[in-house]
A protein has these predicted regions:
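Sec-exported extracytoplasmic/periplasmic mature domains
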Residues: 38, 97-105, 122-126, 134, ...
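Ligand-binding cleft/hinge of the Venus flytrap
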Residues: 56-64, 68-73, 79-82, 94-105, ...
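Extracytoplasmic small-molecule ligand-binding "clamshell" domains
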Residues: 27-131, 320, 335
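Bilobed "Venus flytrap"/periplasmic-binding protein-like clamshell domains
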Residues: 44-53, 78-100, 134-135, 154-210
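Bacterial N-terminal signal peptides that target proteins for export
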Residues: 2-10
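Extended ligand-binding regions for polar small-molecule ligands
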Residues: 23, 27-28, 34, 92, ...
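Acidic, polar ligand-binding/catalytic clefts
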Residues: 62, 94, 98, 102-171, ...
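C-terminal motif of bacterial Sec signal peptides marking the signal peptidase cleavage site
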Residues: 18-21
Length: 374
């Protein structure tokens, strides 16, 4: 009887211990993504790191192999790399950090390729993916991610040597096309080949650097990818003027940031930070005139900038500060300023806005549009 009582005591203690452990684990996992970000003090953002105009380490003396999240990289080099990441996708991350911390530099960048990007989100290694990712139905419903608003309307194109006389996909019959694996470009190319009964060969490569290395070596006669990526990578080729992007467009490629779908608050935060960039341009608010606009009597501007500072402001309802839109504009500007800085005519990788103009652009209306802030 005594032995049974001792056993029961130990059993009860074990149960209580397990319950306590489960409770602690539950408490830890119950923290929202916003709370976790605030506690650690920075945003974890996944970018490519090797795509000029979108996300690129602007350091000539840093080898591209240093971007592979190597834990053995000396801290001074790591910090130098982190401070030198620039681009359109990078500025999306900086806008999110600005809204949360009032500091655009409160970001740590992880350099990821197309194959690992979704695992990085689902595993919690990154809080947001800003990596020229195409929004598709398969990704939307099959992977545990939620897409933010589209930030760049793109299409799939083909890069060839100008002297090759190739002017269409059909002209590549019997030739080799290089494409990055695990991308919509790869699947679209396979569909085109089957649908049109074409005879080119598809060479899939995981590393984008290998795609262009083999292309320059003549092992493939064309590269296919998003037109924006072709345009920016074209600048990195040894003789850029010897190559052209064909006029033929193979697909629609709406590019958007993405987050994990298990935290609705975080989904809404990222969504309305992106919309804030667009709304700021629509309202004519930019880095230069922000302070002047704060004196406006326009109710739309008052509401958007959170000038009343009330508890029911847009920012407060998201879990952010009432002036979150002001923070974004002050540090990174509006959507148009981000585009101009990274992809505008005076940038190192100019790409015409075209479809990425605001919907109400009088000369060339685009598709960029924000729901009402009310």
């Amino acid at each position: 009887m005594k032995f049974e009582n001792i056993s029961n005591v130990w059993l009860l203690a074990l149960i209580l211990l397990l319950l306590n452990a489960c409770s602690s684990t539950q408490t830890l996992t119950d923290k929202s993504i916003l709370e976790q970000i605030k506690e650690r003090g920075w945003l974890n953002c996944g970018v490519s790191g090797d795509l000029p105009g979108f996300s690129y380490v602007n350091l000539e003396d840093i080898e591209i192999t240093k971007l592979d999240n190597d834990p053995n990289i000396p801290n001074n080099i790591y910090q130098q790399i982190q401070r030198s990441v620039v681009g359109f996708d990078v500025d999306i991350c900086r806008a999110i950090a600005s809204a949360i911390f009032d500091d655009p530099n409160a970001v740590k960048y992880r350099f990821i390729d197309t194959k690992e990007r979704f695992e990085e989100i689902s595993s919690g290694k990154i809080d947001v993916l800003s990596n020229t990712t195409t929004w598709t139905v398969e990704r939307d419903v099959s992977i545990k991610i939620e897409f933010a608003p589209i930030v760049f309307y793109d299409g799939q194109g083909i890069l060839v040597r100008e002297n090759s006389k190739v002017r269409s996909l059909r002209d590549l019959n019997g030739k080799v096309i290089c494409v990055e694996t695990e991308t919509t470009s790869q699947r679209n190319l396979e569909d085109e080949k089957k649908e049109r009964n074409l005879t080119f060969q598809i060479r899939q490569l995981q590393d984008k650097r290998d795609v262009y290395r083999l292309y320059e070596a003549g092992e493939c006669q064309a590269v296919t990818s998003d037109i924006s990526q072709l345009a920016t990578n074209l600048k990195l080729l040894e003789n850029p003027d010897e190559h052209i992007i064909l006029r033929e467009i193979l697909s629609k490629e709406p590019l958007a940031p993405a987050v994990i779908d298990s935290d609705l608050q975080w989904v809404e935060i990222v969504r309305w930070i992106v919309f804030a960039l667009i709304e700021a341009e629509e309202l004519g608010i930019n880095q230069n005139n922000l302070e002047q606009k704060k004196a406006s009597t326009n109710p739309k501007i008052i509401r958007f900038l959170g000038l009343k500072g009330t508890a029911d402001s847009i920012g407060s309802r998201l879990g952010l500060e009432p002036d979150y839109a002001q923070r974004i504009i002050r540090h990174v500007g509006n959507y148009g300023e981000i585009y101009e800085r990274n992809l505008g005519p005076n940038s190192s990788t100019p790409i015409e806005r075209g479809l990425n103009n605001l919907w109400n652009n009088t000369e060339e209306p685009g598709l960029i549009y924000s729901p009402p802030f009310r």
